[in-house]
Each structure stands twice: as C-alpha cells, then as structure tokens.
C-alpha cells in the first residue's frame, strides 16, 4: 500500500513538473498577443485620442493581464517620475519586467527597438514605428504558436513518462 502511494505521488509530481515546463509554450503566444493588443491600443490613443504617453500607458496597463500590464504600468511610473526620455523610461521598464515574461530575446529586441522611437517622432512616424513593431510581433507570434504545437504536448507527456520510468527503476 505504501509503495502504491509513493508511486502515485511520483507520477503526480513528475506530471505536474511537465505541465509547469510546458506552461512556457502556452504563455509566450498569449503574452505576444497581449503586447500586440497593447501596441494597437497605444496607436489608437496616440493617433485619435491625442493622449499623452504616460496617460495612455496607464490606461493600457489597466486593460491588460499580468505580467504584460506591469510593463506599461512601470513605463507610466517612469514617465511620471520625470525620466530623461521616453526611450530611457521604456528601457528601464523593459529590463525591470523582462524576467517575469515568457518571451525570447527576439521579442526583447523588437520591444527595445520600438522603445528607441517612443516620443521622438510626430504622430504619423510614431504610427509607422508601431506598425513595424506589430509586424515583427506577428511573426514572433506565429513562431511561438508553431513551437507550442510542436513541443507542449511532448513536454507534458515526458513529465508523465518520466514518472513511470522512475517508478519502474525504483521497483
């Protein structure tokens, strides 16, 4: 009876580990979609609402789920504190929040390049830079969805199978 209970515990623990490891593949496309929605909202606020950047960032942060909302909240806070420029505020916010995101280096570079253009162009040029970032994020989203389809189920299965292997080795 005790061996059976231990075996069940091992399978549950390794399966849970597999699901947690697979969560990265689930979170990345979701966070990229949120970033795209945020940039589209930012574009609308800049182009049609004529909203200041810090106010638009606050509003966007309220609309998004964690951890992506934290990026825009931190950006708004940096701007409110009187950061040197929007570029500096964006970079500091991105560095602060980056470890909580499930994104790759390529998405970091897209967001960093986008931040370099924030607040230094007129509205039309800013809109073009937002659309460029959206295009890059769209390609990253397709890549993330492909990686999710390819790897998520395998990692979940490996967690379960690792538990079964461990049980067989211990018996």
Curated annotation (Swiss-Prot):
* Alphabetical list of Pfam families matching this protein: Spore_III_AB
Q: What is the lineage of its organism?
A: Bacteria, Bacillati, Bacillota, Bacilli, Bacillales
One GO BP: sporulation resulting in formation of a cellular spore
Give UniProt keywords alphabetically. Answer: Sporulation
Where on the tree of life does the source sit, at the highest rank?
Bacteria
Name of the protein in its database record: Stage III sporulation protein AB
């Amino acid at each position: 009876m005790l061996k059976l209970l231990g075996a069940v515990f091992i399978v549950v623990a390794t399966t849970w580990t597999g699901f947690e490891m697979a969560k990265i593949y689930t979170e990345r496309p979701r966070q990229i979609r949120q970033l795209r929605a945020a940039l589209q909202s930012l574009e609308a606020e800049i182009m049609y609402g004529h909203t200041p950047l810090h106010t638009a960032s606050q509003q966007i942060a309220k609309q998004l789920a964690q951890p992506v909302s934290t990026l825009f909240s931190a950006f708004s806070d940096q701007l409110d504190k009187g950061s040197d420029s929007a570029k500096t505020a964006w970079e500091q916010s991105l560095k602060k929040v980056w470890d909580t995101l499930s994104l790759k280096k390529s998405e970091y570079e897209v967001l960093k390049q986008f931040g370099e253009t924030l607040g230094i162009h007129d509205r039309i040029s800013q809109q073009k830079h937002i659309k460029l970032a959206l295009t890059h994020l769209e390609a990253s989203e397709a890549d993330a969805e492909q990686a999710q389809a390819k790897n998520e189920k395998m990692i979940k299965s490996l967690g379960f199978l690792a538990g079964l292997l461990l049980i067989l080795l211990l018996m």
